[in-house]
């Protein structure tokens, strides 16, 4: 065998050459002139043994700023949360880890039940009637929700708050361009959606209004007030929500939301360079047949035993491609499983306690910044993120913090020139008092 991982012997090679009627491998390249063929050896490193290779790769990995050694205050949609140890154990089981879309559900009962549990827990958190098996991430879930609204209402205008994550808005723009839809962004005031601006844009051509709760700045939107404005014009009300926050906040479904979407990353899914994540999509029974992605339902077999099936499949592209409710194919089943296991391990009380710790630690950090002389820009209620006016370029501050073992907050000036020198600080349950104090003191020293 020429290579330990490539099962080809000299006899195999000889047989293959004889089969195609050539004597040597060089004859395969006879059409290529000698003058342009490469001669000599490639200037690459020699092969290493497995221990040598592991040592070299470990050295390269140590150059990364990992969250085991650095205290992270970076959020903006991707958060450093606690994941119960059991999550990785369940995910690593081969029947889950290698499973693909269960097109033959009768032999995939374990996979289907895991997805069904995910759907159930998402419904409980959001206060909605039905949830799908998952979406790619929060951004694509938001865009798919807007497409559903446009198709249902047969209207072409989508209103989205500028307090919605800028990357989600960018995904929405991409989707809307292909569907020839108009996207109008509503400005924010004091860190939340400007209701006067929203009211002025509302008319009978609006398909939906999209807000985030908590929003991109961590602020809590007034969903009850927004819902009245939206439904007066018979538009759909879409809310993007951090599912962890719903452990303590009133769910959007209680405020009359038609569709609730978001990213399940806070539950058991690591940051890992920003992805992959797991979007969720929940809605009311009225839109059950228009929801994108796969739906798992519970039923009974001919013997009266409980079973799980893929239901309402006529909506999907593998049944009727031209009339499918969306063209999402593989869902994020493995990450949805991670979220399910994390939520199950935490339980209702655990999710609530985790959310409360995010609030209390973020409030402590806010007070420390104010005592140090920093201005916390928005004064409304918030979940686990808030905006600090740094008076200096955020990139410079973050570069200095990184040398101290701290990953600083998000530079809001990247997306909004009005917020240059403003940092979005995220504080999760994993941050300690000592880490928060160190962050504030180091930033105070940089001022």
Curated annotation (Swiss-Prot):
GO BP terms, alphabetized: glycine decarboxylation via glycine cleavage system; nucleoside metabolic process
Keywords annotated in UniProt: Oxidoreductase
Superkingdom of this protein's organism: Bacteria
Gene Ontology molecular function terms on file: glycine dehydrogenase (decarboxylating) activity
Top EC group: oxidoreductase
Reaction(s) catalysed by this chain's protein: N(6)-[(R)-lipoyl]-L-lysyl-[glycine-cleavage complex H protein] + glycine + H(+) = N(6)-[(R)-S(8)-aminomethyldihydrolipoyl]-L-lysyl-[glycine-cleavage complex H protein] + CO2
InterPro entries: GcvPA, GDC-P_N, GDC_P, PyrdxlP-dep_Trfase, PyrdxlP-dep_Trfase_major, PyrdxlP-dep_Trfase_small
Catalytic activity, EC: 1.4.4.2
Functional summary from the UniProt entry: The glycine cleavage system catalyzes the degradation of glycine. The P protein binds the alpha-amino group of glycine through its pyridoxal phosphate cofactor; CO(2) is released and the remaining methylamine moiety is then transferred to the lipoamide cofactor of the H protein.
UniProt similarity note: Belongs to the GcvP family. N-terminal subunit subfamily.
Quaternary structure annotation from Swiss-Prot or TrEMBL: The glycine cleavage system is composed of four proteins: P, T, L and H. In this organism, the P 'protein' is a heterodimer of two subunits.
Protein name listed in UniProt: Probable glycine dehydrogenase (decarboxylating) subunit 1
